């Protein structure tokens, strides 16, 4: 029982940064920083090998064998779960997947 390595792909990191930039543009720089910190802390929590989330229902992600988890009820994180590594592949608004 332990932790797996967490790798974050560029599309996921870029999506978090774009959301933070939007929050900051609304005059909320501390909120933007907090959002980024919370998102990346959440990514690291995915490393717990005891936790396995459901496969994604979004067809393109389902075909890629991604697993999905909700973040703050507004976003979806898509990741690949491997024996020794979690690969965070995407981070999107849940509204875009409907």
Annotate the PLM regions.
Residues 1-65:
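Basic, Lys/Arg-enriched alpha-helical interface segments
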Residues 61-62, 70-72:
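Short solvent-exposed loop/turn micro-motifs enriched in small/polar/acidic residues
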Residues 26, 71-98:
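Enriched for short, Lys/Arg-rich terminal
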């Amino acid at each position: 029982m332990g932790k797996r390595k967490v790798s974050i792909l560029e599309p996921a990191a870029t999506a978090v940064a774009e959301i933070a930039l939007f929050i900051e543009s609304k005059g909320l720089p501390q909120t933007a920083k907090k959002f980024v910190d919370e998102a990346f802390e959440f990514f690291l929590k995915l490393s717990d090998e005891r936790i396995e989330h459901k496969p994604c229902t979004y067809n393109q992600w389902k075909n890629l064998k991604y697993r999905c988890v909700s973040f703050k009820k507004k976003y979806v994180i898509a990741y690949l779960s491997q024996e020794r590594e979690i690969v965070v592949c995407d981070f999107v608004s849940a509204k875009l997947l409907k």
